[in-house]
UniProtKB/Swiss-Prot annotation:
One annotated GO biological process: phosphorelay signal transduction system
Modified residues (4-aspartylphosphate): 57
PANTHER family per UniProt: NITRATE_NITRITE RESPONSE REGULATOR PROTEIN NARP, TWO-COMPONENT RESPONSE REGULATOR
Domain Response regulatory per the UniProt entry, residue ranges: 6-122
Positions of the HTH luxR-type domain: 142-207
Domain of life per record: Bacteria
GO molecular function, one term: DNA binding
Keywords: Activator, ATP-binding, DNA-binding, Nucleotide-binding, Phosphoprotein, Repressor, Transcription, Transcription regulation, Two-component regulatory system
Protein name per UniProt: Nitrate/nitrite response regulator protein homolog
Record feature DNA-binding region, as residue ranges: 166-185
Length: 208
C-alpha cells in the first residue's frame, strides 16, 4: 500500500482551516498530520512531523505567511510549500516565489482542483493559478535572462513550465532523471533564482 502524503495546514482562520482539513481528509491519498493557527507553531510542528506538503496562508496575525515561509526554509524544512490565499497582489506573488514557495493558489480554487493540485505539487510540479499566470505575463524585463541558457537547458525549462516532474521531463527528452537535475541546477544558477517556480515565472515573463 502506498504511503499517504502528509499534509500540514497553517492558517489563522479557524473556519477556513477546518474546511480545508475536511476536504483534504476526504481523499485517501492524504493524511493531515496537523492544522495550526500560527506561523511559529507551524515551523515547530513541521520540524516534528516532516510533512510532504505544507499549505500556508499568506495574511496571518503574528508571524506573516512570508516570514513563516522564510523560517521554514531557514530551518531546513524541505516540504513542498503551497501558498493558499485570497491575495493576488503582484508584489506578494513575486516575493513569496523568490522566498522559496513551490506554488500559489487563490482561495477561490474549486475543491476538486485543490486536491489535484496538492497531488501535483507533491510530485514536484509547479502549481500556479491561471489568474496568477496571467499576472506574471504582465511583468516586463528589458533584458531576456533566458538568453544565457543552452538549448538543452531551455528545453528543460520549457517542460518545467508546463508542470512536468523531473521523471516526466526525463522521459519526454529521452535523458536520465539525474541529467535533468543537473540541467535544473545549472539553469537556476544562470537565472539567479532559487526554485523551479521562480524559473517558471521568468519563462512566462519572457514568453508573453
Amino acid at each position: 500500500m502506498q504511503d499517504k502524503l502528509k499534509v500540514l495546514l497553517i492558517d489563522d482562520h479557524p473556519l477556513m482551516r477546518r474546511g480545508i482539513k475536511q476536504l483534504v481528509e476526504l481523499d485517501d491519498n492524504f493524511e493531515v498530520v496537523a492544522d495550526v493557527s500560527s506561523g511559529t507553531e507551524g515551523i515547530s510542528v513541521a520540524l516534528q512531523t516532516s510533512p510532504d506538503v505544507i499549505i500556508l496562508d499568506l495574511n496571518m496575525k503574528g508571524l506573516s505567511g512570508l516570514d513563516t515561509l522564510k523560517g521554514l526554509r531557514a530551518e531546513g524544512v524541505d516540504a513542498r510549500i503551497l501558498i493558499l490565499t485570497v491575495s493576488d497582489a503582484k508584489n506578494d506573488i513575486y516575493t513569496l516565489i523568490d522566498a522559496g514557495a513551490d506554488g500559489y493558489l487563490l482561495k477561490d480554487t474549486e475543491p476538486d482542483t485543490l486536491l489535484e493540485q496538492i497531488k501535483r505539487i507533491a510530485q514536484g510540479e509547479v502549481i500556479l493559478s491561471d489568474s496568477i499566470k496571467n499576472l506574471l505575463l504582465e511583468r516586463t524585463h528589458e533584458d531576456n535572462p533566458l538568453d544565457s541558457l543552452t538549448d538543452r537547458e531551455m528545453g528543460v525549462l520549457r517542460q518545467i513550465a508546463t508542470g512536468l516532474s523531473n521523471k516526466q521531463i526525463a522521459a519526454q527528452l529521452f535523458i536520465s532523471e539525474e541529467t535533468v537535475k543537473v540541467h535544473i541546477r545549472n539553469l537556476l544558477r544562470k537565472l539567479n533564482v532559487h526554485s523551479r517556480v521562480a524559473a517558471t515565472v521568468l519563462f512566462f515573463e519572457q514568453n508573453r
